[in-house]
């Protein structure tokens, strides 16, 4: 079986593939001060009750945007999985051409999303990923990563508002407001964040398409993708497992 790991600034996602089937997946908070032994305890616990054991894992593919933990994950794979992990990089991206001025600047998560999206759709694409940052990545029909846009993420933007405005309460961002015009402070904040980000998405996507001069299919991934997609005029599909699928494809291409 293949273990895929997406190490993000906020969350780390683990997925287990048997051939092309995603068997299980888990999302945890990213810890920068963990050890390979703690990772073993954590994953052993996650696997308990599932049909998978650590001994079933023969390979690992990892995408990371958190350099301080990479040595720890490498040590875990070597010590407990008896394998050397495959790390996603511009030189290891399943045939995707990177047309960035400096390919080394492209985050592994963005590369993986491009791989997964191109494999599924084979057309001009814009991939919107709602993570710690909200990223917009343009992938051409011929499988090239053309570049993109990086904006502050929904979570960190909301945190900045709450931390700098003492009288504003924290609000639940997991549901869409019934109306744009809020009737109380909490409703007004929620409306501003959710509809504001939908407007940001639609505005940036529209500008990207205008600049390119032709239609692009727009897909979204990340934790809040279903929420924003529901009020966006441009997002056409939500792919919750896009990053894991991209990691699987990169792993398969190296066999």
Swiss-Prot record:
The active site is at residue 109. Substrate binds at residues 100, 107-110, 185. It holds the Pfam family Pan_kinase. GO terms for cellular component: cytoplasm. A monovalent cation. Ammonium or potassium. GO terms for molecular function: ATP binding; metal ion binding; pantothenate kinase activity. Its EC number is 2.7.1.33. This is Type III pantothenate kinase. It comes from Desulfosudis oleivorans (strain DSM 6200 / JCM 39069 / Hxd3). The gene is coaX.
